[in-house]
Amino acid sequence: MTATVSTTDTPLNASRASGPGFARKAKAYLALTKPRVIELLLVSTLPTMIYAERGFPSIGLILATLVGGAFAAGSAGAFNCYIDRDIDKLMARTENRPLVTGEVTPREALVFSWLLGAAAIAILWFGANPLSAWLGLGAIFFYVVIYTIILKRRTAQNIVWGGAAGCFPVLIAWAAVTNSVEWPAIILFMVIFLWTPPHYWPLSMRYGEDYRNAKVPMLGAIAGAKVVSVQVVLYAWAMVACSLLMVPAGGAGWVYTVTAVLAGAWFLYESHALYNRAQREDIPDKRAMKVFHGSISYLTLLFIALAVDPFVGPAVIGG
């Protein structure tokens, strides 16, 4: 008689079977946090800390602020995915999010959102200071309640006021270092506030059909390209002007000043190019996406310059 040995239930095979499943689940949870958004938010955090310190803060403070800020942004993103799961399935851009595909259940997403938010506040409170923790809580509240629940489905100005949540990282960073919120932090807050519309509206022009299908009144989806391009140009000019306030009111030096002028001029050129194209085309997709990607490059360059600035020469005014 021949003995048959089954290997389907051995611990090794069980481990192999569970491994990919665990990896998929972890990846799904990560996707809930909108990591690309977190990356963009963190671009502003460390440079602001360096500028506030006029040098490098302690490694412990940097880690606490970056991790706490990332967790706060991730919590807000996960709450957003939970609340918007009904419209995400209607949009090609978001139809593969974990709550739409079923990789994560609504209950799991909600618990994850709360845990991540609680961890963020605790890390900022004990790793930095209570002020930065309160600002982190304010950022989560603003994105989840003000933007996602109240504004997003009701007004074409949703991203203008709701986008203020994305400005909080500079306040958190400044508060973590100085335990206060001063004029340079407020100016940087306003730069990102004014940057948000010319960043997102070109994207909503490109994916206008998605937003219309989901009945989300994003300006780029419900207004014509001519109207949207005018708004993009106006906000771009206001943003560049605001960025230059760091020179008289924020103690900025030559590195920041030159970068703000040159990068600002380049982004204004791209914004005006979108406007010119919009006068001839109903949906200037390629030019709109060029402005979208250009806005990311602009903000990255500006904050890199902010980080380098304290190490290279005195302030332009009063130095």
Swiss-Prot record:
Coiled coil: none annotated. It catalyses: heme b + (2E,6E)-farnesyl diphosphate + H2O = Fe(II)-heme o + diphosphate. PROSITE patterns: UBIA. InterPro entries: Protohaem_IX_farnesylTrfase, UbiA_prenyltransferase, UbiA_prenylTrfase_CS, UbiA_sf. GO terms for biological process: heme O biosynthetic process. One of its GO terms (molecular function) is protoheme IX farnesyltransferase activity. PANTHER family: 4-HYDROXYBENZOATE SOLANESYLTRANSFERASE, PROTOHEME IX FARNESYLTRANSFERASE, MITOCHONDRIAL. This is Protoheme IX farnesyltransferase.
